[in-house]
Amino acid sequence: MDRAAPLSIPGNTSYTIATNNFGAGVYPLDTNAAYEQNAADALGVTLNVTNNEFTADKSITQLQNQLASAPDGVAFLGISETLFPVAAQYCKNAETPYVFFACAPKDEDVATFEQDEYYVGTVVYSPQGEGAGIAELALADGCKTAVISAGASGDYAHDRRIIGFTEAFEAGGGEVLFVSHSADPSEGVQKTNDLLTAYPDVDCVYACGNDYVAPAADVVKSRGLEGCKIYGADISPNICQLIMDGEVEACSGGVFASCGVAITLLVNYLDGNVIKDSEGKAPYFDSLELFTVTSDNAEDFYKFLSDEALSTHTISDEEYQNLLVRNNAEVNYDYYVDFMANYAENVYAKVEANANRA
């Protein structure tokens, strides 16, 4: 089949897509998987999902096993930059189209992938931009000094959030006093306590992931540090509650949308409706605009994210379906860019509409 030529594909066409959850039981990763599943359900495709059990090597060995069953395509979550070239080579050898999501390969690796006819593209967000946005909020709130609580060094999202926050905070006249890394979330309380023992007068804590926000709030509250503000990433209902209670100032969210959008990109490719950028290359989408939860909208977001029918449906079935060329002749590279750039505003509108119905 000439995958570069648009085809007329019936709406009930079904594909099997191999994908991976780096580790089940962790909110951000499980939410990634839920967004993929929702997109698959909306588009009528089947997912074959592995649990890598937080082991990078397993993501590759399990991918090999998945490829042996000849899926129609692969949507791969690479938790480390070193995994992408390996996964790409296995997919190429198996002549299986593949898309990357959530975490991004190195630029030089992307240039290599672009020479591979089976490379569909990459759909990510900018964790560096995410961190910068939170830094701007902290500065606007009057913060001059900050400490950062993050996961282990090498974590794709956390490392880039740290860079983005630090650069923006210091460019705005603030100072990041220290960055603390926890080997796993269970160290969050102790590490934050150590931070605030060393820097008891710090203006704010930036917790770089969902699992580090509540521990920071607990420590600040237990130590009676009323002047210390907390900012976070990876919003969830419990963090919404902390914002409503005045224990957290703000938290970013929406990174999971890239997972569902990646499925649509792969399905378009499988349909023969290949999305290319202006240079004729496989697309690298990083325009996803994230939303921010503050005291102004925390209650509405809590209602939305606490509803199982809504929490992982910030993109509707109809929106997923309208990202397929088979359903919408207007879909092209620019359509995807605009869709992702407008994501946050669309979410705000859905959250507000849901609140008004309640």
Regions found by a protein language model. Give the residues of each.
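Hydrophobic alpha-helical segments within soluble ligand-binding/sensing domains
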Residues: 2-3, 10-12, 59, 120-147, ...
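Structural recognition of the beta-strand scaffold that forms the well-ordered cores
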Residues: 18-20, 48-50, 73-77, 98-102, ...
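Anion (oxyanion) recognition and catalysis
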Residues: 41, 92-93, 170, 244
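Hydrophobic alpha-helical
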Residues: 74-96, 165, 177, 181-241, ...
